[in-house]
């Protein structure tokens, strides 16, 4: 769940750096709502991928509940609906605190959570999946969390949001790179399909390295942001692993470590902003 926790954490930390205080209840509510939206999206994705034939015995990724027969697709979809409903209820409170911008972000996030694998043209079955993640788990989540605290939007918030969004997109890129062949068999034509493996590998390098330019972009506004450099060796190790790992289940570990990199980067950035 780090992909949903990190942007709220960073947006709130930046607001703390700006205001020297935090509205803790709205911050906690935003965190829970973001987690519920991610849970709902993952659950619906689990059921929808099974129904569309994307989860086959040849799939390299971890076992999934619907494909393994642990639960029916209908049961998983009901669980997703419960999760989305919980996020909606929390969103009512957040809308009362933050006004119409938060209402808009909340409604868009819920709609996107369904549209990711639902509807006639699912986002996950197109080349726009990484863009979706960049926008919703980067730009909107960080900036929304910051706005909830400050009722404003700054260049620094956008810079932080961009960095977190790039790393979130890298997580999805690894997933789609690993599953390219089985995805193509199910007509799931992701960005990796259109780029090819070599250019997808080059894109992964950019997504991982560009966030480390953030301290430079801040131009001494928040010198503590240089803390993120502490996880640069981890990032470089990941890039080497991605480039040399034979295609197979080893990419599950690369996927998990890419998510860990985003968590480490977000945590170090948050600490650097508030210390």
Where are these regions (language model features)?
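Topogenic membrane-insertion module of multi-pass membrane proteins
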Residues: 1-29, 120-121, 133
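Small-residue-rich segments of transmembrane alpha-helices in multi-pass membrane proteins
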Residues: 2-11, 131-146, 164, 193-197, ...
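Membrane-embedded alpha-helical segments that form the functional core of polytopic membrane enzymes
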Residues: 19-44, 103-111, 155-174
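Acidic (Asp/Glu-rich) catalytic motifs at the cytosolic membrane interface
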Residues: 36-60, 170-192
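Intramembrane alpha-helical segments
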Residues: 62-152
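Interfacial loop-to-transmembrane junctions
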Residues: 114, 238-266
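Functional transmembrane core segments of multi-pass inner-membrane proteins
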Residues: 132-180, 186, 198-201
């Amino acid at each position: 769940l780090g992909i949903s926790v990190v942007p709220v954490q960073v947006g709130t930390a930046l607001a703390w750096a700006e205001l020297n205080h935090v509205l803790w209840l709205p911050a906690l509510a935003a965190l829970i709502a973001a987690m519920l939206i991610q849970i709902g999206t993952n659950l619906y994705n689990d059921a929808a991928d099974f129904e569309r034939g994307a989860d086959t015995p040849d799939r390299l990724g971890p076992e999934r509940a619907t494909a393994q027969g642990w639960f029916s697709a209908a049961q998983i979809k009901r669980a997703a609906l419960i999760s989305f409903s919980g996020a909606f209820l929390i969103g009512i409170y957040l809308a009362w605190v933050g006004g119409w911008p938060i209402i808009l972000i909340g409604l868009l996030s819920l709609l996107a959570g369904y549209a990711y694998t639902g509807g006639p043209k699912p986002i996950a079955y197109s080349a726009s999946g990484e863009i979706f993640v960049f926008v919703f788990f980067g730009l909107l989540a960080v900036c929304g969390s910051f706005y909830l605290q400050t009722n404003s939007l700054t260049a620094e918030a956008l810079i932080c949001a961009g960095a977190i969004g790039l790393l979130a997109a890298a997580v999805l890129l690894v997933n789609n790179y690993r599953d390219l062949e089985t995805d193509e068999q199910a007509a799931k034509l992701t960005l990796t399909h259109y780029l090819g493996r070599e250019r997808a590998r080059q894109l992964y390098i950019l997504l991982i390295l560009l966030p480390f330019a953030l301290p430079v972009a801040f131009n001494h506004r928040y010198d503590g942001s240089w803390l993120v450099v502490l996880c640069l060796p981890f990032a470089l190790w990941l890039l080497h692993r991605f480039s040399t790992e034979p295609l197979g289940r080893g990419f599950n570990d690369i996927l998990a470590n890419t998510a860990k990199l985003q968590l480490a980067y977000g945590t170090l950035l948050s600490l650097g902003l508030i210390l």
